[in-house]
Amino acid sequence: MATFPVVDMDLINGEERAATLEKINDACENWGFFELVNHGISTELLDTVEKMNKDHYKKTMEQRFKEMVAAKGLEAVQSEIHYLDWESTFFLRHLPSSNISEIPDLEEDYRKTMKEFAVELEKLAEKLLDLLCENLGLEKGYLKKAFYGSKGPNFGTKVSNYPPCPKPDLIKGLRAHTDAGGIILLFQDDKVSGLQLLKDGEWMDVPPVHHSIVINLGDQIEVITNGKYKSIMHRVIAQSDGTRMSIASFYNPGDDAFISPAPALLEEKSEVSPTYPKFLFDDYMKLYSGLKFQAKEPRFEAMKARETTPVETARGLRAVRWNTTKRNQN
C-alpha cells in the first residue's frame, strides 16, 4: 500500500527545495492530501490550542452532546444512520470579519489563543498557495488573488470533537465528502484516529502525527487547476473508545470571487474548452449546501449548466434536486 505523503517544511528553503516541491506536487495530483511537519507553528501554541479545546469540550460541549444523543435515541439504533454525523462542533469565523467574540461559553484566554492560532494558519495557508503556484507555473500570488473577491478570502475554523460511539458500525463520525473551498489545514488529535481518505477505490487512514498539520485541497483548487490537482473524498470513522479532537481551518474564496480554470493551465488551442466551469463562489456554496455528501461531479456539471442558458440551468438544478430528494427518501 502507498505511504501517506509527509512533507518536511524545513527542507523548502535548502538544497532539497526541488525535491520537496515535487513531493507536494505529487501529493496534490495523486492524493489531494499531505501532512506537514516543521511547518513553523510553535509546538507551545499547538499544545495550548489542544489543551484549551479539550478542556472546553469537557466543560461545555460534552453534556450537550449526551443530551442530544439521548433525545434522538441514538444509543439504541439497530440500522445504519445516513442523516447525521457523530460529532460535536462549532465554527469560528476569522475573515473577512471575526465572530469569535460572539460565540457563547468561550473563556477570554480561549478566544485570544484561537485568534493567535488563526493568524499563524492564515500565513501558512498563503505560503502553501504560493508553493502550489510555483509548482503549477502560475505567477506568485495567483491563487490568493483568485480567492480574494472584493473583501478578501473567507477563512474560518471548524472545531469538532468526536466522542466515543456505542454503534460505530452504524453511525459515521462524519460522512464521506469533498470540501467545497480552497485549502484546508487540520490540526488533529494524535492519539485517537478516525480520518480516512479514498485512495484508488479504498479507504485509507490519515495517520495522526504529533504536532503535524494535515493539508487537503478543496473543490475550488480542482477547478482553478482544471483538474490537475484534485479534491478527494474523505470521512471520519466513529470510534468506540476515546474522543477525537479535530480543528479544521478553511481558507476559501470570498463570496463574490469569480472562480474559473487558470488561463495559463488551459491548452493553448483556442478551440479546446475548459473542462471545469466558471462561477461565483457563493453560487457554488449554495448548491454544495444541499449536495455535500454526494459526488462532486454533478455539482460541477450543474455549475457548468449556468454557463449556457437560464432554462438549461433551471432544468439541470431541478434534476439534481429531484435526484437528491429521491435518494433521501429511499
Swiss-Prot record:
Cofactor: Fe cation
Molecular functions (GO terms): 1-aminocyclopropane-1-carboxylate oxidase activity; L-ascorbic acid binding; metal ion binding
Induction: By ethylene and wounding.
Biological processes annotated in GO: ethylene biosynthetic process; fruit ripening
Pathway(s) the chain acts in: Alkene biosynthesis; ethylene biosynthesis via S-adenosyl-L-methionine; ethylene from S-adenosyl-L-methionine: step 2/2
Coiled coil (residue ranges): none
InterPro entries: DIOX_N (IPR026992), IPNS-like_FE2OG_OXY (IPR044861), IPNS-like_sf (IPR027443), Oxoglu/Fe-dep_dioxygenase_dom (IPR005123), Plant_2OG-oxidoreductases (IPR050295)
Domain Fe2OG dioxygenase: 153-253
Source taxon at top rank: Eukaryota
Keywords: Ethylene biosynthesis, Fruit ripening, Iron, Metal-binding, Oxidoreductase, Vitamin C
Binding site for Fe cation: H177, D179, H234
EC number: 1.14.17.4
Catalyses which reaction(s): 1-aminocyclopropane-1-carboxylate + L-ascorbate + O2 = ethene + L-dehydroascorbate + hydrogen cyanide + CO2 + 2 H2O
Entry's family note: Belongs to the iron/ascorbate-dependent oxidoreductase family.
Assembly and oligomerization: Monomer.
Name of the protein in its database record: 1-aminocyclopropane-1-carboxylate oxidase 2
